Design a protein with these regions (language model features):
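Calycin-type beta-barrel ligand-binding domains and close structural analogs
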Residues: 2-22, 85-189
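Amphipathic/hydrophobic helical signal segments and adjacent flexible N-terminal regions
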Residues: 1-102, 184-189
Length: 189
């Protein structure tokens, strides 16, 4: 059985059809790992597509924590944007118009899952499974629409740098491989 078969998909509804939010205690290690990612980051990216096309892109990322989340929750806002004057950005978005030049996503940490208000490749809500490799690395696994996405995020050198490797399968075929080298520009306030 494939890791990305339909049986491994995470449902967007609470099992049993219950509409209420589940009462889950957030893992303190994951909460700590997410707090280490707060702040402004400069992201230098390489995308390799299934047609062997390789494109580069520079982005800015900002991760913030909500000041007053509900009891037992950890909530975050992720914002991303590219510099308007960047030649690589113009070329990238002209060739791949389904990617967004800027956007905002909100997310809630529930145990070992992250409920996102949207995905990077869709505007629909997405539930992501989290696995912590060690205190510096977490793996995110998402399934939505025709996409299966595996993302490795590793904090490096006292959290001054971050490396992300993202593999995206479309309808079971590896379609996009991304490598992001990120530099912390500012710590959270």
């Amino acid at each position: 059985m494939s890791l990305f078969s339909a049986q491994n998909r995470v449902p967007l509804t609470v099992p049993g059809g219950v509409a209420a939010q589940p009462s889950i205690q957030v893992d303190s290690n994951l909460r700590r790992w997410f707090s280490r990612n707060l702040g402004l980051w400069r992201s230098r990216r390489q995308y390799t597509f299934s047609d062997d096309q390789v494109l580069h892109l520079d982005m800015n990322l900002k991760m913030e924590a909500f000041a007053h989340p509900e009891v037992g929750e950890s909530r975050y806002r992720f914002s991303w944007w590219s510099d308007q004057e960047d030649q690589h950005s113009d070329e990238f978005f002209a060739r791949k118009p389904w990617f967004e030049r800027s956007g905002v996503m909100e997310a809630t940490l529930w145990g070992h899952q992250l409920q996102r208000s949207r995905g990077y490749l869709t505007g629909d809500p997405v539930r992501t499974r989290l696995r912590q490799v060690d205190e510096h690395e977490t793996i995110l696994e998402s399934h939505y629409q025709q996409w299966d996405i595996l993302e490795h995020i590793r904090l490096v050198d006292q959290d001054r740098y971050r490396y992300r490797a993202i593999y995206s399968w479309e309808n079971g075929d590896l379609s996009i491989v991304e490598h992001h080298h990120e530099i912390r520009m500012s710590d959270p306030l």
